[in-house]
């Protein structure tokens, strides 16, 4: 997935073109994130196989505060789902959308699907379980799991990213936090 808080961008277009040029349709491309119909149409026309929806709605995301961009997750999902359906009517190509952000409670999944999302990003939800790669810690007598987002300084310090350019122009878009520990995944998620 070509993951960015600014998915409606020339960078995403060039990246999708590069992947298509080198790998054709053998690689499925997810792109995003976007929050409106124009962003969806742009990425769909660029050739994305699925599109992520949401800027600033994640539980540990601070993009709205640091960059001044974003939109409510429900509003974004509804508008992009409508654009997806119109795109399908016009082209015959169905481009699924992924609601990315704002899932804290179980019922939020139902809401995201009811608003038109085809599938859901569940970072915070799954970070609570034994299977997540983070440490289990005790805070004020309660077991918690560490949790941080890809836009946080902690994730960037792993040096997985070649951000290029001037480091002073880089924005931190996420924070570190904790979520209540929930035990093993198999005891909590029906399969």
Question: Where are these predicted regions, by residue range?
Answer:
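Glycine/Thr-rich beta-alpha phosphate-binding loop at enzyme active sites
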Residues: 1-16, 27, 32, 36-79, ...
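Alpha/beta catalytic cores of nucleotide-metabolism and tRNA/nucleoside-modifying enzymes
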Residues: 24-26, 46, 68-99, 104-191
């Amino acid at each position: 997935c070509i993951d960015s808080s600014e998915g409606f961008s020339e960078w995403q277009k060039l990246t999708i073109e590069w992947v298509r040029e080198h790998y054709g349709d053998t690689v499925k491309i997810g792109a995003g994130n976007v929050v409106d119909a124009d962003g969806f149409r742009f990425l769909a026309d660029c050739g994305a196989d699925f599109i992520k929806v949401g800027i600033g709605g994640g539980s540990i995301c601070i993009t709205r505060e640091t960059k001044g961009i974003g939109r409510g997750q429900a509003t974004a999902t509804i508008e992009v789902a409508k654009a997806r359906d119109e795109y399908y009517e016009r082209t015959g190509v169905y481009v699924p959308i992924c609601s990315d952000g704002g899932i804290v409670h179980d019922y939020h999944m139902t809401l995201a699907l009811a608003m038109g999302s085809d599938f859901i990003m569940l970072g915070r939800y799954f970070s609570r379980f034994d299977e997540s790669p983070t440490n289990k810690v005790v805070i004020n007598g309660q077991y918690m799991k560490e949790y941080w987002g890809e836009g946080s300084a902690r994730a960037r310090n792993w040096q997985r990213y070649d951000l290029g350019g001037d480091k002073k122009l880089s924005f931190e878009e996420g924070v570190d936090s904790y979520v209540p520990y929930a035990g093993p995944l198999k005891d909590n998620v029906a399969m």
